[in-house]
Regions:
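Glycan-processing catalytic domains of CAZymes
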Residues: 1-137
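Amphipathic alpha-helical oligomerization/assembly segments
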Residues: 134-149
Length: 151
C-alpha cells in the first residue's frame, strides 16, 4: 500500500476487490474494499453479520463497496435499504446477471459486466447516492394513490 500510495499520490484511491468479507488487516492495504460481490437474492437473504461483519465497525462507510447484480424492479429498493442499514458507502447495482452455464467462472455464459445496467437502474442508484431514495419512494406511493382515485 505504501509503495502504491507513493507512486500514485494521494489523489488516486487504492481499491481492492476480494468480493467478499476480508480480514480486517486487509483494510490497511487499501482505501476502499469491495466486500460484497454477488446477486441480489443472496444480498437480501443474508444477515448483516454475513455481509458486513462487526469487525468493520468503527471504519467509515466510504471504505466499503458492494456490487450487487441481478437486481429487479421488485427488489431494487430493498437492496438499497439494506445497503443503507449496513452503512455501505459505495454501491454498484446492475440488473445484468451471472451464470456459468456452458462457460466457466472466468468466462461465464452470462456476465453482469458485459453490458451496462438497464436505463431504469440509473435513476435508482443516483437517488441512493444523493440520499433521496426514501423520499422518492414515498412520493411515488402518493402519486400511485392519486392516480388510482382519479380512475
Amino acid at each position: 500500500y505504501k509503495l502504491l500510495r507513493a507512486a500514485l499520490g494521494a489523489d488516486v484511491p487504492i481499491i481492492i476487490n476480494p468480493g467478499s468479507n476480508t480480514r480486517l488487516e486487509m483494510m490497511s492495504a487499501c482505501d476502499i474494499a469491495v466486500t460484497y460481490e454477488s446477486d441480489a437474492t443472496k444480498y437480501l437473504s443474508r444477515t448483516r453479520q454475513e455481509i458486513h461483519p462487526d469487525q468493520y465497525q468503527g471504519l467509515p462507510s466510504w471504505r466499503f463497496w458492494h456490487i450487487v447484480h441481478g437486481i429487479t424492479k421488485e427488489n431494487v429498493d430493498k437492496v438499497c435499504e439494506k445497503a443503507d442499514d449496513i452503512d455501505v458507502g459505495h454501491l454498484y447495482l446492475t440488473d445484468q446477471t451471472f451464470a456459468v452455464g456452458t462457460g466457466s467462472e472466468d468466462t461465464p455464459q452470462e456476465d453482469p459486466y458485459d453490458d451496462p445496467p438497464s436505463p431504469w437502474v440509473v435513476p435508482k442508484i443516483r437517488s441512493w447516492i444523493k440520499g433521496v431514495l426514501p423520499l422518492e419512494q414515498r412520493l411515488s406511493a402518493v402519486e400511485a394513490k392519486v392516480a388510482a382515485k382519479e380512475n
